[in-house]
Amino acid sequence: MYYKEDLGYVYPERSDEHMIEVKHLRDTHFDEHFNYLDKSTWFKIKRFFLRIALYLVGFPVCTIRHGLRIYGRDKLKKNKELLKDGAITICNHVFMWDYLCVMKAIRPRLQYHPGWKTNFEGPNAPFIRIVGGIPVPTGNIRAMVKFKKAIDEVLETKQWLHFFPEGSMWFYYPDIRPLKPAVFNFAARHNKPVIPITISFRKRTGLWKLLGKKPLADLHIGDPLFPDTTLSIKEATDKLHKEAYHIMQVMNGINPGDPTYNTDQNIDNYKKTM
């Protein structure tokens, strides 16, 4: 169901522009020497304890804080055989730590996910790394090559990968912003299914009003989308890109003909809806 509430946020003009400031705590050189994909034994041990902490603390907290309801987990079970060689999940990015909601939705799987490099220099950096964060480098071609190799390795080893393809987080924004095409290029090159996930909102009512003022969250899992292997990589990327954007909007109750339904994924042309 489509629901929006004016919470007084001032959204940036560009749809991929960030609206938060991260306290800078450390200088990290995200260059060609950085270890983008941690495969150490110590990292695996931390991931083991992460799984326990998520079930005992993380998932209950995000459920209570956001009134989280999850729809569509049956689709993961129904397509289990098709997803056994890995998948890419995508979701709109609408509040801090909405990734925990995604992790709860696809449990018991743990993923990797590319993220804004500034977050990896802030107070949450250690936790972001443990939950699978891979910083996206900028301004360095050799660093970007190594980053892409890390992403390729995740997919080649049949693991799951998550993207927030809008490129930034906008607090409680109800519409789906344009999606960056790189996500779908990875899917097309590796022939991996893309699982669309969206977060929509509902009004706080009853006892939920005692726990906060912001809208509650509904998470929707869609059917997996598969690259068209009869097309070239570019054509398959474009097709998947278009299909995913349409489906994510429909999943959030935004249908063709509605005032905020959008087909133009050019970020420079996007007009914010509130």
Where are these regions (language model features)?
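Structured helix-beta-strand junction loops
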Residues: 64, 109, 130-131, 157-158, ...
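Membrane-anchoring hydrophobic helices of lipid-metabolizing enzymes
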Residues: 1-88, 97-101, 268-274
